[in-house]
Amino acid sequence: MKKRDKIVYWVATIWLSLGMVSTGIVQLLQLEEQVQKMSALGYPSYFYTIIGIWKILGVIAILLPKLPLVKEWAYAGFFFLMSGAIFTHLAVADEASEYFGPALLLVLTILSWHFRPANRKIQLSKLEKTA
């Protein structure tokens, strides 16, 4: 792995982790302002708890060594969650500033996934042996 790729991976992964953990904590705390925003988007308040837990568990999966299959699920979850957030903001015609957070986390998800080291990827040879 090139040094540049390793740097891109860790910068993207650290920022992604900070973003997901911080928003996950806010969602678990269900602060009034955030609950109102979520309600305006058409989501029930209990949805916040589910998303907050998923975000924090996803960050743990991405940062822990090994568990490549769980990492793939976490990256997929982050991708679906952030792309869904972007489309939700589009559907309710929110201001452009509302797209920035989800779009940034989506880009960081893609960068972290793309530049992850080989030991954090699923090895196809292992999958083929079990099939």
Where are these regions (language model features)?
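Membrane-interface extramembranous regions
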Residues: M1-A131
